[in-house]
Amino acid sequence: MERIKELRDLMSQSRTREILTKTTVDHMAIIKKYTSGRQEKNPALRMKWMMAMKYPITADKRIMEMIPERNEQGQALWSKTNDAGSDRVMVSPLAVTWWNRNGPTTSTVHYPKVYKTYFEKVERLKHGTFGPVHFRNQVKIRRRVDINPGHADLSAKEAQDVIMEVVFPNEVGARILTSESQLTITKEKKEELQDCKIAPLMVAYILERELVRKTRFLPVAGGTSSVYIEVLHLTQGTCWEQMYTPGGEVRNDDVDQSLIIAARNIVRRATVSADPLASLLEMCHSTQIGGIRMVDILRQNPTEEQAVDICKAAMGLRISSSFSFGGFTFKRTSGSSVKREEEVLTGNLQTLKIRVHEGYEEFTMVGRRATAILRKATRRLIQLIVSGRDEQSIAEAIIVAMVFSQEDCMIKAVRGDLNFVNRANQRLNPMHQLLRHFQKDAKVLFQNWGIEPIDNVMGMIGILPDMTPSTEMSLRGVRVSKMGVDEYSSTERVVVSIDRFLRVRDQRGNVLLSPEEVSETQGTEKLTITYSSSMMWEINGPESVLVNTYQWIIRNWEAVKIQWSQDPTMLYNKMEFEPFQSLVPKATRGQYSGFVRTLFQQMRDVLGTFDTVQIIKLLPFAAAPPEQSRMQFSSLTVNVRGSGMRILVRGNSPVFNYNKATKRLTVLGKDAGALTEDPDEGTAGVESAVLRGFLILGKEDKRYGPALSINELSNLAKGEKANVLIGQGDVVLVMKRKRDSSILTDSQTATKRIRMAIN
């Protein structure tokens, strides 16, 4: 107090004020403080002080030739005095204004190319639609999300090499561009940025944004793809949300989405093959997504999803250490347990062998629509705090947690036998048996669980066995919370092992993932997925199997031909013929095979009866184990389009049609390729063009341009007309149907209409 009074007295004297404002600061400590180091200690003050001067900027001497000494108003733009301590000129801020108005202009052609992601963002926002604002409690959970739309998926190191190669090609230093995407991007960017005048450092910085995925751990309620995250601040607050539909999609979101679909399809297909792991690897290596190899995408893309992680594990890549059960990602946050086999009896007195986790553990459970915190002891649920979007989602989480707890009352709630099987018809393990059982119907489970009175805790309410909320009672140990549970934030990845049945384990032997955990949800991929493996032919149904099988034979005809004559058994056992067997009626498979093999043997024995088209046509039928019988067939049946369709042993049919004039084969109206040699066969019928999804309007109409091949038809828009070349070089006018529902009748009417159109 005394000191302050003393200071006040001093300040009241004018001399004190003069000393403080007029005299120079010459105390060494103060001078040191403000002058040591390169770091500016008071940037705001420095800026104000500098800008108050007449010439606060220094510039290269050349500026004197480029800028007049005075502007139109006669104000000085630069000073003749040199900058102290450097060979530069002192320049006024007015010079900047003059330069901006009158300085040289440069080409703007590179701006949209360099700042591509920014321009695209503006377009997305321009075409996006913002809906109404709703006020309600937002259950946000922190998730790791992608924050810059429109990026490639290079690692920081890969991107660095690309940037150096594009922006500073003459710099020294070894740059190894190995991955396909690196090479493509480098080539593309070098072309785009030829003669680019934008500062190289700026280009490098922007390129980095475009090449590397940037993720943040942000609270989100709703869409997590990058085009939603870029407007997060506009679409959700603490107590409000604004509806928004993005005005465009970006490739990185499409890649993530398509990768998940491809991985799910591949895992599902691998599960049912003889050696799941080998099949899975074969499919991953032969699949492309949006024209890029799936294995390259898997190496670069950080998406965490059960099927994607199984594929990564198979390739020997590290994955997240959390494990999956019932579609929820579990992460242990504290405690530990040992595992012990134990036999338990269900309510139906069926014996189950389960691996019991002994010990106290806490987990976070994160699903798409619900999250929870679970505390459990040995075969006992202590507490479950769950939050979710709706009653249904909350119920799903509760069922998974109850099954995971392995409590006796859950096992005793089983009614009836447990005999769920996977796609390969193998019994599921006991924990998944229980899960499937209660996911079908959890009434008994909830009724038998028990209820308890609850205390009034802020933000928490109880939930009754019928899944209605309550403030008085709740399922034992279970509470519903308004707050979500954050996703596990760490991006740490661990080394895992995978067995031939695609079960993924960490180094302690805990199962993290298995095919049972792969979602059955079907979706339509945004990017084209090309499965080259014959195992995936059936994904698009029987017709695709049929077309692909014949395409494969034609593509590999040279090799097939030699094997056919020298080592037929090996040819018959090729895996490419496996999918085809599902099209042949079970009852006749063996007979067909015996018949075709005998026919082929006769061809080999009798010179001059080698008939290429017939061999190609009948070869897939010879792959089944043959039955010895004297049966002769004039046609073989295949099950496509919901019914049996015939392939004629001699001659053409809608299923298999060889056009002698063009030497092309069409299978179900789809082009299956060209034969290089000329097989001698009778003329093919006009029935070839069973055009699904097209209406035949009549004879050729020159107004609609030159005749298209059957292949080119797929590019037509609905309702568009075109001339098309069918069968024996005849041309008819067709229109692509506006509705898909009428496709079925096309097959029956097409043949009649073609005849009429030609005659």
Swiss-Prot record:
Q: Which organism is the protein's source?
A: Influenza A virus (strain A/Chicken/Scotland/1959 H5N1)
> GO MF terms on file?
RNA binding; RNA-directed RNA polymerase activity
Q: Where are the transmembrane segments?
A: none
User: Could you tell me the superkingdom of the organism this chain comes from?
Assistant: Viruses
Give a yes or no for keyword Repeat in this entry.
no
List the protein's name.
Polymerase basic protein 2
* Any one GO BP annotation for this protein: symbiont-mediated suppression of host mRNA transcription via inhibition of RNA polymerase II activity
Where is this protein primarily located? virion
Spell out the SUPFAM superfamilies in the cross-references. PB2 C-terminal domain-like (SSF160453)
**Gene Ontology cellular component list:** host cell nucleus; virion component
**A single Pfam family, by name?**
Flu_PB2_1st
On assembly, the entry states: Influenza RNA polymerase is composed of three subunits: PB1, PB2 and PA. Interacts (via N-terminus) with PB1 (via C-terminus). Interacts with nucleoprotein NP (via N-terminus).
Q: What does this protein do?
A: Plays an essential role in transcription initiation and cap-stealing mechanism, in which cellular capped pre-mRNAs are used to generate primers for viral transcription. Recognizes and binds the 7-methylguanosine-containing cap of the target pre-RNA which is subsequently cleaved after 10-13 nucleotides by the viral protein PA. Plays a role in the initiation of the viral genome replication and modulates the activity of the ribonucleoprotein (RNP) complex.
Q: Which InterPro entries match?
A: Flu_PB2_2nd, Flu_PB2_6th, Flu_PB2_C, Flu_PB2_CAP-bd, Flu_PB2_middle, Flu_PB2_N, INV_PB2, PB2_helical
Keywords in alphabetical order, please: Cap snatching, Eukaryotic host gene expression shutoff by virus, Eukaryotic host transcription shutoff by virus, Host gene expression shutoff by virus, Host nucleus, Host-virus interaction, Inhibition of host RNA polymerase II by virus, mRNA capping, mRNA processing, Viral transcription, Virion
According to its UniProt record, where is this protein located?
A: Virion; Host nucleus
Q: Where is this motif: Nuclear localization signal?
A: 736-739
Q: Which family, according to the similarity comment?
A: Belongs to the influenza viruses PB2 family.
> Where does the entry annotate site (Avian adaptation)?
E627
The record lists the lineage as: Viruses, Riboviria, Orthornavirae, Negarnaviricota, Polyploviricotina
User: Is tRNA-binding given among the entry's keywords?
Assistant: no
